[in-house]
A protein has these predicted regions:
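Glycine-rich phosphate-binding loop of ATP-dependent small-molecule kinases
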Residues: 1-175
Length: 175
């Protein structure tokens, strides 16, 4: 989308090598590492986040990964501190957690829809930074991915999805 792409044939040629390298990193992590890995997958609707999460779950050894999708808060989560829903899914040492959605989602959405002002938004981002520093200091390797589409490309994708009446669209989530 943004010009940073590989030809499909080139990717397919390197795919086994990339898969093997990723499994080797996971194996080394699992065998006595003092670290854990948190992979954060966020971005705009339709940008391919789900495909990447599926690929990671296919490629990695699922015995030492946990994938968590964050959508609307549950009643239990609403009655607890804001970060609790994320904190309880942190991976133990030697393991990987994949967060599909993250602690960035709600502040960004709330700011975009003007439900919070800039000061509240800045405060929430500062709290997120504090959490990430704490996790990093404790040995968590945080890998963040933001998936983006130009507005025109996203609108075309969503319009194409609306045209497909025979299947349920994954792009109907409300905030």
């Amino acid at each position: 989308e943004l010009g940073r792409s590989r030809k499909k044939s080139e990717y397919k040629k390197r795919e086994p090598e990339l898969h093997t390298a990723l499994l080797e990193v996971q194996r080394r992590l699992r065998l006595g590492s003092s670290h854990n890995v948190l992979i954060i997958i966020s971005g705009v609707e339709g940008a391919g986040k789900g495909a990447v999460v599926s690929r990671l779950n296919t490629w990695l050894d699922t015995r030492s990964i946990r994938t968590v999708a964050y959508w609307s808060e549950s009643d239990e989560e609403r009655e607890r501190p804001w970060m609790w829903r994320f904190w309880r899914n942190m991976p133990p040492r030697g393991e990987i957690a994949i967060m599909f959605g993250s602690w960035y989602t709600q502040p960004i959405v709330d700011c975009a829809y003007r439900r919070i002002d800039e000061d509240v938004f800045a405060h929430r981002l500062a709290r997120i930074a504090e959490l990430e520093h704490m996790l990093s200091d404790d040995g968590t390797i945080i890998v963040k991915f933001w998936f983006h589409l130009r507005r025109e490309a996203q609108q075309k994708l969503l319009a194409d999805e609306q045209g497909k009446k025979s299947q349920a669209s994954p792009y109907t989530r409300k905030f």
